[in-house]
Amino acid sequence: MPKKVSKETQQLSLQISHTISCSLADSKPYCQKIFSSSIACQPSYIRKNGLLFTDDSLQWLKSLCDNSVDLIFADPPYNIKKADWDTFHSQEEYIQWSLKWISEAARILKPSGSLYICGFSENLADLKHPAMKYFSSCKWLIWHYRNKANLGNDWGRSHESILHFRKSKKFNLNIDEIRIPYSEHTLKYPAHPQAESSQYNNGKKSSSTWTPHPLGAKPKDVFEIPTTCNGMGEKTKHPTQKPEELLRKLILASSKIGDIIVDPFSGSGTTLVVAEQLQRLWIGCEKNEEYNSWAIKRIDTIIPRTIEQWITFDRENSKRRESIR
């Protein structure tokens, strides 16, 4: 029996039903370069900077053209039986399915593009090696959080992993957009010569001095960002929703204004919301209509801020969290 959708979903579906008949060519000029002429479905939601589709992710990815998008963020099922869309019979079946959509993701990425995949370390460890045949390199990132209780009788989970696949050696990475605050020790001694014994000076005396970068230190491969929780304005009922702060870091790192961001498992819309905040073009796909209704509501109620204000917003939140520990 089909799952019943909420009244909110039905109301939002009625509000956007008139967009279903719009053609892709008429709705967004850049779509002509991204979608093949054989695309089967029309967008469920159209906005100036983006499109949202209700469709199966793998089939939908096949409708996108080669070398057409700048960045893909994917938060696929984790094979942990957490929802009715996460019911693989075995890890082998899960890996084979994952490689199918990853190959399509690699195909549609521009040579300078990146694919970020979020998941549990034990799954991504099985996936990384076979997926590398589609990419030039990969960086393993850690999203660490402190605000989840350990409700079991085992090691409590306090992180998820993110694989950063790069299609070529000439991938985009905007270091200055994602710099982090220096430590108190560094700021206490802001200018100093490299000591003769320093590993960075090769045992040679140097008269040159090091000074902190005005935007902060270079980013590390561990991000400490809380999970979404009750009381946060962005929180929805989605069981695996990712925080906007995490997506802002990744999108700022690997794209620029006007780039095309794709999320083939867009869920409650965090990637789309953040792309809209940061003045990127975006295209999302999610087969669950209720999740799409939550995404649409979030996109329609975005608080207007400049990119610089969003960066400052996240830095101030990070400092606040540090100060109350």
Predicted regions mapped to residue ranges:
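Cysteine-dependent PTP/DSP-like catalytic domain, specifically the C-terminal lobe
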Residues: 290-325
